[in-house]
Every structure is written in C-alpha cells, then in structure tokens.
Amino acid sequence: MEESNKTTLIPALISANKAKSILIFCNMKITCDKLADDLYNLGLDVLTLHSDLEQKQRDETIILFSNKSYPILIATDVASRGLHIDDVDLVINYDLSLDEKIHTHRIGRTARAGKGGMAISLYTHNDYDRVELIKDTFTDIQEESVDKIEDDLSYKIDSELRTIFINGGKKQKLRAGDILGAMTAGIGLKKEDIGKIDILDFASYVAINKEKIAYVLTELSKSKIKGKYYRIYEK
C-alpha cells in the first residue's frame, strides 16, 4: 500500500473488526502526533503516548485509555514499555517494528489475561526486508489486500464514557468506596453509569457515562466527599 493511504485506512480497519479499544504503534513521536491530528480531523477521539510527555501526563493518558474514555491510543515503543492495559482488542502497527522482538511485544498486547484480539501491520514496498523477517518469525501471518477490507459504515468509533478529575487521592484518605458513595447515595447516579475509579496520591479519576458528565460536574462540585469539598472537572 502507499504511505499516504495508511491514515484513511485506519477507520475502516477499526469498523471492520468492531474494535472498541485500539492501540496504534508508530516508530517516531512525530508520527504519533501527526497521525493523532489526522485522525482527530476524521472525527476520532485519540490519545498519544511518547517520550515528550512528562510522567504525570503519561500516567493520565494510560488511565484515560484503560478506563475506556478514549478508544484509540497512539504510542511509540519506548513510551509503551511496561504498559499494562487489558482488553485491547485491536493492535495496528502503523509503522513496522524494527525487529521481531519489538513486533512480538506489540502484538502481545491483544492477548493479555487470556483474551484474544487482532493485530494488523501496515506496510509499503519500502518495508520489504522487514516484512520478510516478520514472516520468517511468525509463520501464521495472513496477508490481505487493502481492497478486501469491508468497512462497516454503521459502526460508530466512540466511547460511551468520559473521565472526571478530582483533586484528592490517597494522601487525603480517599477510597474508591468514598467516591462511589458520593456519586450514588450522594447525588443519585446509578452504579451502571460509573466505570473504573483510579486513585493516585493526590488525584482521582472516575470514568462516567458521558451523557451524565454535565450533571455530575454540577452536583458533585456542590457536594462533599468524605466530609470535604474537592475541585472537579472533566479530562
């Protein structure tokens, strides 16, 4: 395929595989940022993870992807080393990895916790040597022409969740149960509208049904969590 066609192919790959959590690997951070801008212009919500981000930004990015607030994470190999995220159902190698060990590490993201998934590698005629190396190592690879990809135009690439930030965490003795109670018994939110709760030392992140975000921001800002008011906003 042509390099210029890679970006426009990604929505088709996602919809064809009905993917909800997509990890895209690029070899360089400049490619990550360019691809993120291009996909955003196509109407997709994306996050990036590379070495230009400070550790706090990396941690927050991982939280927002792992709690399903954003469906797509674009990452470099260095930044994603040691990354533990379950339920990734599609890995796309936008750039082919530089060796088979990195390739193994990438595609293994879809098999965590005994779960399956799909890994797709995009390549051009300039990648011939790397393609042959990967084929020699992974004998069960199936090659497919881009013309055979069946795009499901009815599939919506989006997340049902968004995340709220609370400026209090473990150092303020906050626990997941405290936040859950403030949202359910406190402001009347249903448990099914609340997703993953991540509590760090000085901050907490809560995935919320995006249809309820405005309500939660308004009501929780006026309510106490474990006897104290906290600053709350959407990430």
For each feature predicted by the language model, list its residue ranges.
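Conserved helicase RecA-like core
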Residues: 1-235
